[in-house]
Amino acid sequence: MLWAMQQATNSVVEALYNDPYYLGTPTIATDSMQWYHPFKIITWFMYYHQANYLFTSAIMWIGFGLFLIFIIALLLKPKALLTSHGSARWADYKDLLKMNLISSSGVTIGLYDSSFKRGLTKQLRRLEVKKNEKVAYAEMEFDEKQDKVLDRIPEKINTWLEEYNANTDPKRRKELAIKIKQAQAYLKNPPKFDIKKYRWTPTYFYDYFYKLAVKLYKKLPHFYLRDNSNKHLAVVAPTRSGKGVGLIIPTLLGSWKSSVIVNDIKSENWGVTAGYRKKMGHVAIKFEPTSDDGSSARWNPLDEIPIGTPMEVSMAQNLASIIADYEGKGKPDHWTANATNVIMTVLLHLKYAHYTDPENYPTPPTLYSVAAFLKSSIVIEQDKDGVYRQSAKGFVEAAKNLVMYEHVPPEGIDIVEWNTKACSYETRHFTQADLRAIYPNSTSLNSMPGTHPIIYQAFVEITSKPDNELGSIVSTANTALKEYLDPLLASNTSVSDFCIDDLMNYKKPVSLYLVTPPSDLLRLAPIFRLFFEMMVRHHARSIGTYVNGQAKSNYKHKCLFLMDEFSSLGNLQSFAATLSYIAGYGMKVFLINQGLPQINGIYGKDNQILMNCHLKIFYAPNDNDTAQYAETELGKTTIETKSKSRNAGRLIGYTNTSTSQMARSLMTGDELKRMEDQEVIIASGSPPVLTDKIKYYENNYYLEKLINAPIVSDVIRTDPVRNANAKREALLSKQAAQSSSDTFTYDNNIKK
């Protein structure tokens, strides 16, 4: 329009022959040129009635400008969205901003590059496919030739052996011996395929250019989507689909800056990311219950029970209920509920007895000592019908002897406990008066002031049960505790090098890796379920304080639960039920599963796990249930279709074209299965995102952060007596010796 007004102004100037008398002072004037600004025509229009013929061309130019604006507006007008059968669409950049996925930190969930970089990525993938094709054919050709050579060599060896005799010329005998030796060596260790031997062939050039392209591609900066909200995430991705290299490792390599708990099967994530997280200033802890080399930290669940405080019973009940429900059903039956009571009673008794009678209870109680206490109390007896049954007579006798056990003597006991703020062990004197203050309404304390009232009542209840029933109850408790009789597991749960409170309240953020060998996955699932359950119950007790009507959190650091292979932990029914509220307590859950059948098989089809996750990420599924679920979540869009019909008359036929609208899934289940290097992100209340997968090994941004993992786990509790670990010290000494031998020292006494 500005151009049209300039032309209109110029037309009036030309009509008046550049006469300043009529036109006024020009905006720019030189010896050879006079220029009036475009909006001058507006001032001159006040003389239209005196000389309208001067403005004929100007009006035409202005009209032409308005016409151009109208045409451009029509061309640039966005096409109206078709919504009659569905309004689903893919998210754009504005949607990502509203979804708060443009963040400098958080959980890394996808790659969102420009169109140009996406094109480069596609070309790199095509080159990779072509390279793999060429190398595969070359390797097949090599194997075919190799097989023929290997088939001929034994025949040649036999021929040479027949020729190798006393009548053969010595020079020839020497040649034959060398050939036979070389042939036998070839058979013993045949050469392997080597791409370098294919120089100046298309195969070698494809391989060379692919490696060169990857090297250049790694230097490109990329844009990553990150979720730093307080809402949960769920990933549904089949095995070997790239969730580790695309989600877990990028998140741990600096993206998530607060505390994190990683369910780390095979210790891969520890090996790749622990070094960098330690460099970030985190305390990098590895808890591997089956470790025997001293590299793992240790954790005793019984240390989480603060005896001599009002919290002791609730914490003991929580711990006992989780242990007794070793299958994670979340709905205890009669035997499980009573086994919970037995376990709670025994562990509370052992906790107090360690301080009351250190001669008979010399070591702090552990799950091993609880299991051993119960195991030694079961005997097998033959009833009157000749059937052998489990009897708890030994346990009944022990319980009867302990009913009136004095847990707090008149002089009191000195309880040793860890002070998380001072980071040291402290001794607290506990007396019978303190016990009375905790249980002011207990009548048993009137006659037995040193006997713990809860333990007393529990032992009385236990001893009053019939032998057969009690035998089954104790047997249920033993079944729940049987894994802790393993010497390795007992050793790694004998003392605590860290505690649950440290994860969110230590002075530094903590990165905890729960390492499980695949061979022990099912066996160790109960202790990891125990850890997660206790973590939630401990930190979800109080949401914080309120200042000026706003909540102020109690924790120092948020904590991410990065639960890779979530289903491998077994049934976490009670944990799954907490997903609806624990986000408000600073805990963010990142669940990773292989497919919906895996979740439904454990929690049932009516589970609410995915419903409680704000963000859901889908890789190409390999089962129909997941594909159908994702298709439904994406929704329907409206498309326009055209149909043609031809009416063939006698002389002249004609074609009739009709347009109609119909519903279509934004992406069908079949299309989801063929996504290859793409992923779908579905967020509540926002359009879904179709984006690319991350491969951290293709970007120097992540490769430069790869640092060797620590040789041993960090520990928070470092008391030289209570937390002594000879194997750990041996590993550290060995590392120190290697470091000193590798260090350059200048000796001034060395002469030339």
What are these regions (language model features)?
Residues M5-N18, K79-S87, S114-L220, Y224-M587, ...:
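P-loop NTPase motor domains
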Residues L579-Y581, Y585-V680:
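Conserved ATP-driven motor cores of ASCE-family P-loop NTPases powering translocation/secretion/packaging/pilus
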Residues V12-A51:
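Membrane-interfacial helical/loop segments at transmembrane boundaries in membrane proteins
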Residues S84-R118:
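Membrane-proximal cytosolic interface modules of multi-pass membrane proteins
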Residues Q50-L81:
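Transmembrane alpha-helical segments in integral membrane proteins
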Residues D92, T366, T668:
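Residue-level signal for threonine
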